[in-house]
Amino acid sequence: MENDKVVGLVKKISEERDEGAFSQIFDFIAPKINAYLIKNNLNIEQAEELTQEVLSTIWIKAKLFNPEKSKFTTWAFTIAKIKK
């Protein structure tokens, strides 16, 4: 997914609480976060639970994402690293 599209989806989440936009973000980033967590020594259950926490944080804090400072994937993985 192109960064411009992702930025637009995150903006919809932050401004409109758009569940459809969140669903697209979820489908895009959840498998990547989950794989990252498993690669970093979490078991499948722990990785799935933490992935849910990361996505929940993205939903709650979408307005804090600044596309001028980082790409969305960088921001999402930073959240995962902090929660890990």
Model-derived segments and their meaning:
Residues 27, 52, 67:
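Phosphate-coordinating loops and pocket residues in cytosolic domains that bind phosphorylated ligands
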Residues 22, 26-33, 55, 77, ...:
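Hydrophobic alpha-helical core bundles mediating ligand binding, dimerization, or RNAP-core interactions
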Residues 49-56, 60, 70-82:
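Structural recognition of an alpha-helix C-terminal capping motif at a helix-to-coil junction
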Residues 1-31:
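N-terminal module of bacterial RNA polymerase sigma factors
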Residues 14-24, 34-53:
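Short, charged helix-capping/linker segments at alpha-helix termini
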Residues 14-15, 42, 55-69:
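Sigma70-family region 2
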Residues 33, 37-40, 58, 62, ...:
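Hydrophobic recognition helices of helix-based DNA-binding modules
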